[in-house]
């Protein structure tokens, strides 16, 4: 938004960049944001959740969204992929490519991102149980295209605990599942410094029927569990915590939501 230097309300009243006293945006403890100019200076990534049919179908959709002005990609996978099953598995009948894109193999992932410069676009992948496998495929595609893994920018949802609590798309028991999460955190911390290895998600918990307070409580508890698991695996919290992201719901009870955030 470099071209827009002055902001006004619909009534023409100028809007200042910062109001009130106390900690300022971009300064410790960052309760008002991590960037000094916030979204006036650093506009958020515009990405539409997309995925359907075959990898080729979704690749065409990705390109259409980027041509329309999207600045990032957000990948929706079908139910068999989310559950770690191949499209020809008998339990996949009726679900292949229905609620997202079907990705069974590395060749599918190559087709999914064909002719897209992964060094210039950030990619969000909404995947949990098989997140480590899909990340490995993504890295392989990028490196085949000449992009170093250290240059990749994006996010894995990779929040398996909320699956037991809300969405129910889990594959393994909790302890080995959290081990997989911490393994991904360790890999990205060492190899992919621009990658967010977990999107700790309250959204699904709220949609499953929780209150705002419960959404916040479960999400923070899950986040603490991931931090402890990574520390127990030998990682230093300051090395990985800055790359942890969060995904919350926003309901219509204005003041309650302000209090939550």
Residue ranges and their predicted role:
Residues 1-257:
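Catalytic alpha/beta active-site cores
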